[in-house]
Every structure is written in structure tokens, then in C-alpha cells.
């Protein structure tokens, strides 16, 4: 199964840079540069993850055109900015329905990758309690195309928020 982790792509370059700096600066300052460089290499770059989530959603849109899935999914059409984490969690739960209904390996892999990316991006906001938001089962049921368009809209809310 292919799991892409875009935030790890530049890790090896950063490690080589750290080693190079460490070999030239054996003083205390060089050690600090080395340590901070290695720490920064492992930190996720969450701002890029949301763009990758949108790419995966568009890939799913393209893949479902070739198969017929007659499922309706709980969809948040007009989420309030204060409810975006709750809405995102509902979308992620409903993605599993697409994966199950499609029985398509490409869709399954893309859905799994998307869930990992979104959860990684949500990790800093995942424990936020949002009051006054609808539960997943209270949302309107819509077809897959409308679901994916609404999902993209929610992801864009995360991209545009500070």
C-alpha cells in the first residue's frame, strides 16, 4: 500500500546539511545548529498536508467516475468556521463508506492516504471541543460528488485559517 508522507520528503537533505554544518562547526554553536536542524527535519509541515488532501480528494473524484457507487453520505454543506474540526471528523468517518462501497484498490489506497494526511494535519486541533455543532448523523445526506465538493470546501477553510 502506498502511503505518501510529503512532510518527510526533504528530511534527508536536512540531515546531510546538519552533518555538513556539524563537521565545520565543532564548537558549541555547531552542536546547537546540528541538534535544531535534526529536530526540524522530523517536524511535520502541516500547511502542505491540506493541499495534499485536496489532491487526494480530486483523485477520488476522478476514480469514482469510472465506477458506479450509489451511496449517500452525511455531508456538511455550510459549516460554520467554529465547527470545522467537527465537520472534518465527520467527513473522515464518511470516507470509509466510500472505501467500503467502491471495493476499488486505487480508491482504498487514496482514501487511506487522505485519512492519514488529514489526521496528521488535525493533530494540533483534534482535541478542540466545538459547541453548537451538528453531530454527523444530523447532517444532510448527499451523493458522493456533492460530498467531495463540500469536503474540498472544508479543507479550504483549514488552508485559509490562521
From Swiss-Prot:
Question: Record's SUPFAM superfamilies?
Answer: 4-helical cytokines
Keyword vocabulary terms for this entry: Cytokine, Disulfide bond, Glycoprotein, Secreted, Signal
Please list the disulfide bridges: 83-133, 90-136
- Extent of the signal sequence: 1-29
- A GO molecular-function annotation: cytokine receptor binding
- A single cellular component GO annotation: cytosol
Chain residues in the propeptide: 30-48
Where found in the cell?
Secreted
Residues with glycosylation annotation: 108, 119, 127, 143
Q: What is its main location?
A: secreted
Organ and tissue specificity: Expressed in many tissues including heart, spleen, lung, liver, muscle and kidney (at mRNA level). Expressed in many tissues including heart, spleen, lung, liver, muscle and kidney (at protein level).
**What's an example Gene Ontology biological process for this entry?**
macrophage differentiation
State the similarity comment. Answer: Belongs to the IL-15/IL-21 family.
Annotated function: Cytokine that plays a major role in the development of inflammatory and protective immune responses to microbial invaders and parasites by modulating immune cells of both the innate and adaptive immune systems. Stimulates the proliferation of natural killer cells, T-cells and B-cells and promotes the secretion of several cytokines. In monocytes, induces the production of IL8 and monocyte chemotactic protein 1/CCL2, two chemokines that attract neutrophils and monocytes respectively to sites of infection.
Supply the PANTHER family for this chain: INTERLEUKIN-15 (PTHR14356:SF3), INTERLEUKIN-15-RELATED (PTHR14356)
Protein name in the entry = Interleukin-15
Organism of provenance: Oryctolagus cuniculus (Rabbit)
Amino acid at each position: 500500500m502506498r502511503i505518501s508522507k510529503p512532510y518527510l520528503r526533504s528530511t534527508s537533505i536536512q540531515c546531510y546539511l546538519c552533518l555538513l554544518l556539524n563537521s565545520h562547526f565543532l564548537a558549541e554553536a555547531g552542536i546547537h545548529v546540528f541538534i535544531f536542524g535534526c529536530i526540524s527535519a522530523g517536524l511535520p509541515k502541516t500547511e502542505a498536508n491540506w493541499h495534499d488532501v485536496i489532491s487526494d480528494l480530486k483523485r477520488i473524484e476522478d476514480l469514482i467516475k469510472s465506477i458506479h457507487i450509489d451511496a449517500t453520505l452525511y455531508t456538511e454543506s455550510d459549516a460554520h468556521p467554529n465547527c470545522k474540526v467537527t465537520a472534518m471528523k465527520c467527513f473522515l468517518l464518511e470516507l470509509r463508506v466510500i472505501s467500503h462501497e467502491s471495493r476499488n484498490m486505487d480508491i482504498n489506497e487514496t482514501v487511506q492516504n487522505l485519512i492519514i494526511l488529514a489526521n496528521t494535519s488535525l493533530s494540533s486541533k483534534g482535541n478542540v471541543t466545538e459547541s453548537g455543532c451538528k453531530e454527523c448523523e444530523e447532517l444532510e445526506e448527499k451523493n458522493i460528488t456533492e460530498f467531495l465538493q463540500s469536503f474540498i470546501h472544508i479543507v479550504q477553510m483549514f488552508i485559509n485559517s490562521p
